[in-house]
């Protein structure tokens, strides 16, 4: 049995909140750089170049990449042989509170969605815990801005809709979102399960490295087809995708 102090959890979450808002993971940086190098449309290329300059400035000055510093989504893989010395959830919330305060990050979270009173420290966080074997504890902080979060959709498809119905729903979702999620975007797609489970799967999918395709060849091909359809001219996105 391994014991981890609540203070260590707090310190880690606070650091990750700041890093996640001021740095991009290497796979995302590489994807953005590749996009700006290959983009043929001058206006789009100029936009990507501006995003790249903004990213460099944020890194050099330790400033947020975006003014929307989002809701802190904290994903935890917690080993069954780990004992947390103290309150685990309280430690995470304290880490978010400290990270958003020490990092001078915008506080966006309200205590009640209808009364709209800001909590003033960006808590509570959204905490997702997955139990795994062993004595490890892996914490990932993903700030989720609501420009993209508010464009999320769920659809209960009929069996008869098949894979074509699924692909059409994904492409239509991106089309309807337009510029609201602040492109370029990363799609987190969940398929199957209950209403709540599929939303969890979609959120978790955002953590996958961008440069690693799905290990299942069927879904890897589906990813390629969706990417091609989404990036196609608008007038073509209603067509049946190649299979």
Regions found by a protein language model. Give the residues of each.
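Translation machinery proteins
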Residues: 39-63
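A generic local secondary-structure boundary/capping motif
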Residues: 61-64, 114-118, 125-132, 174-179, ...
């Amino acid at each position: 049995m391994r014991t981890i102090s609540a203070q260590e959890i707090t310190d880690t979450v606070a650091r990750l909140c700041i890093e996640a808002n001021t740095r991009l993971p290497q796979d995302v940086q590489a994807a953005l750089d590749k996009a700006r190098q290959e983009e043929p449309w001058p206006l789009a290329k100029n936009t990507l170049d501006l995003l790249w300059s903004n990213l460099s400035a944020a890194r050099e000055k330790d400033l947020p990449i975006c003014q929307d510093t989002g809701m802190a989504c904290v994903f935890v893989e917690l080993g069954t042989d780990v004992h947390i010395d103290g309150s685990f959830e309280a430690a995470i919330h304290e880490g978010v509170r400290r990270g958003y305060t020490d990092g001078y990050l915008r506080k966006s979270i309200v205590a009640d969605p209808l009364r709209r009173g800001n909590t003033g420290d960006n808590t509570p966080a959204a905490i997702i815990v997955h139990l795994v074997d062993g004595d490890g504890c892996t914490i990932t902080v993903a700030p989720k801005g609501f420009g993209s979060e508010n464009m999320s959709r769920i659809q209960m498809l009929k069996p008869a809709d098949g894979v074509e119905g699924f692909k059409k729903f994904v492409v239509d979702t991106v089309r309807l979102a337009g510029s609201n999620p602040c492109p370029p975007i990363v799609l987190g797609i969940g398929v199957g399960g209950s209403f709540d489970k599929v939303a969890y799967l979609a959120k978790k999918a955002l953590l996958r490295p961008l440069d690693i395709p799905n290990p299942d060849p069927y879904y890897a091909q589906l990813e390629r087809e969706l990417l091609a359809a989404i990036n196609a001219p608008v007038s073509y996105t209603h067509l049946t995708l190649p299979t």
